[in-house]
Each structure stands twice: as C-alpha cells, then as structure tokens.
From Swiss-Prot:
InterPro entries: UPF0761_bac, Virul_fac_BrkB
Name of this chain's protein: UPF0761 membrane protein Clim_1521
Family matches, as PANTHER family: INNER MEMBRANE PROTEIN YHJD, UPF0761 MEMBRANE PROTEIN YIHY
Organism: Chlorobium limicola (strain DSM 245 / NBRC 103803 / 6330)
Keywords: Cell inner membrane, Cell membrane, Membrane, Transmembrane, Transmembrane helix
Amino acid sequence: MAVGAEPKAAVRETVKRNIMTLQPVDVTWRFAGLQEYFRKLMPFFLKNLRHDKIFLSAGSLAFQTLLSIVPFLAVTLSVLRIFSFFASLNRYLEEFIFQNFIPSAGEDLRIHFEAFIGKTSTVPLIGGLLLFIIALSLISTIDRTLNDIWKVRAPRKPIQAFTLYWTVLTLGPVLIGSSLGASSYVWYTVFTEGPLLELKIRLISFLPFVNSLLSFLLLYMLVPNRRVKLPHAFSGAVAAALLFELSKKWFVFYVSRFATFEHIYGAISAVPLLFFWIYIGWLVVLTGAELVFSIGNVLSSSVEPVPKRLLPGLTQLFSVLGTIWRAQQDGSPVHIGTRVVRGALSATAADRIVDLLLQKGVVHETSGGELVVSADLYQMTLFDLYGLIPWELAVHEDLEGYDDDGSETFASLEKDVTVCLKETMAVPVALLLQDSTNQCI
C-alpha cells in the first residue's frame, strides 16, 4: 500500500502544480474577456441611443404624459377609494409620489395637481370612462416604446395587452396602498425611539433612491415582451436610479438659481416647468432601458458578419422556421420565451425573425405560449418565403445609408431576376424541410 501511495502522491503534486500554473492564465483570460466586453459595450450603447432616437421618444412620451398624468392619478386614487381600508392612504400615496418622483421645487405643481384631481371626482360616468381610456393609452404608449427598444416587432395580443394594462391600473394602486399601509404601521410603531429612531432617519435619506430603483427594476423586467435577465435589469435600474436622483438635484438647482421659466412664461410657468421635468424623467427611463438592452445583446451584436450572399436573410429565416416546424413535428413545440436557434445566429436576430413570422402569419402563438406553424408549407414556395424578408433584415448594417439612385436603370434587370428566381425557387418549403430532416437522420 505504501508503495502504491507514492505514485498517487506524485500525481496529486503534479496536478496541483499544473493547476497553480494555469490559474494566472485563466484569470488573465477572464480579465481580458471582461475588458473586451466593456470596450464593446459603450459604442454599442451609444449606437442604440442614436438609432432609437430616445430624445424624440422622450419628448413624445412627455407630451402624452402631460395630457394623461391627471387622469392617470385620478384613476389610481379612485381605485383606492373603492376600498374603505385604503381611503385613508390617499394622502400617503400623494406624499409618496411627490416626495420620490417630483423635485422639492415642485410645490406649486403639487397645489395644481390637488386641485385638478379634486375636480375629477365630480366627473360623470362618461367622463370617468374617458379618463380611464386616456390612462390606458399612456400605459400602451410606454409599453410600445420600451418594446421598440428591445426590437419586439410582434405586439402583444389585444386581450393580453388589455389584461396587462387593466392589472396595472387596478391591482397596481392596491399593491402600492398595501405596501404603504404596512410600512406606515412599522414606521410609526417600531421606529419611534432609541437607536431605531436614528436608523429611521438614515433610512429616510435612502428611501427615494430605493423606490426609484425598485420602480425601474420592475419596469425593465415586466414591460418588455422579451425575457430580460435579472442582473441586466438590475444594472440598468441602478444606473437609471442614480441618473434620476442626480436629475432631481440638478433640476432643483436650475429652478432655484435660474428662474428662466418664470421670466418667460409668467403665471403659466408651471406647465412648461412640469413638461421639462417629465421630459428629463422619460429620458432617464429610456436611457436605462437602452443600457439593459445593450448589456444583454452586446456580445451577440459583435459576431463577425457572414460573407454577403445572393439571398441575404433567407438562410436564417429558413433555419428558424425549420426549427419551429421540426419541434412541432416531434410533438414538443418551441416556447416563445426560449431561444429558437442555437449557433452562429444571435438571439436578437432569431427573435426578430420570429417576430417577422408572427406578423406575416406563417407561425402563431398558442394560448400556452408555444410557436406553431400556421401556413401550409406545401403550398408556400421558397420564393414566397423569400418575399417575406423585409429590407432591413436582408441588408447589412454597413449599408444602412445606401441610396439607390439607379432604381429606374435597374428596374428591368430586377424584373428579370425576379422571374428567374420565381421559376428556380418554385419548390414547396415542406419538401425541402423533409429533405433536410432526412439528411440530419
């Protein structure tokens, strides 16, 4: 036994020595990969900011919010008034909104808000229904804008969207009211004396940041019609919350030191002042959303471009459709939340192709969230499939600014190519899929 133990000990020493030798290399490799990741993140992030035109989107959202904020708050508070338990919390909810989301310089705005919201309680039934529709339209616009950032081309189904918006308008105030009720009880019964009172004072200073952080986190996790990883959403929420707190301090400094709005607009300065603050808020929200999207997609976007092909986009479209079709044939359809294709095709590109297939009615989503082929692939030819590819999916990014000045010159040539392609590709898609399946077997 002693003789056999010596070789084992020697082997262990050799393995240990090799591992110790490899550790610095592994750490260096990981550090280099992390460095490369952050090197690509910022250009990709800035590119998305320009491409999605967030300054224009923030202005559009700010204008609609300015028109909808009073109806939205009126609907929120009216939902709480339905429940007698929450009736006493309306004041706390107003305090919560103004202390956490509106700068301290907005006391005049608060007075106007209270007057406007007080008048909405006397609105008749039809007027109340109109307020509810306006509030729903604001949520719908927010949903559509954030999904545009995530490149979601297939919108939610009308019933699914209405259910989501209805839940936000009804259960949202109830959850906020319950949270405020529970926190108020603990706040005024537990944190009243001694060290706990000092802790209470410290917690108050962090409360606005924590509230902003949780709001952004839920927004980035739940609104996009895509699976967003928690670390990515949390990173973007932290950045957005920090930007939001800095924006509040800058806004207070600007309003208190430079009374530009009062000099220009006089008595009605509260309106442009509110619009300016809402615009800054939406700019922060969209910037955080772009950061969350960039963190999750920067690696897939940095994949080396494939060589230009005669039929750009068709191979990828055929691959995604084939994956969905084979999974359906095997009796285990692909779920909408899972990655459809693995390999060189990035998750973002695959999601865009799935959205395209959903829009064109080639596939549809079942009530269980599964992707199923809708079209008759024995009638659909390869040319029909090729015709579904939009221009932005077919071209490379370096051709985004390409301007076809010779469209008239190449009109006849394009017609000849189309006829040739139509004749050559007059092959049922199902036959090709069956052939590729047999080759895989």
